[in-house]
């Protein structure tokens, strides 16, 4: 895991989040050309692959959120999503096939990743964490 030095303004991100359509646990900020469905990139990668597309095809920004879109551009991201983790919940233990960027927006000292069987805390809001 790489912990980036720069920090992002979580207040600005939260303000832009308010402009998005209603969503529950995740919303995709990018899709493939011609698709405006903000749920298409959510869930399992298999859904994307079964449609004949690749994860890397999801580069077209769906929303006018300039600050977040500038982060997408800076890192050349695709299939970017916001996730909402409810209290006392967690992701299933898994390994992504591609590099991931995580920027906690609201977090606490109990949040962590498990990387190579080691607990890594992610207490800093706005701090980017690159997982490969």
Listing of model-derived features with the role each one plays in the protein:
Residues 67-87:
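A short glycine-rich, His/Asp/Glu-containing loop-to-beta-strand
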Residues 84, 95-111:
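Short, conserved beta-strand element in jelly-roll/cupin
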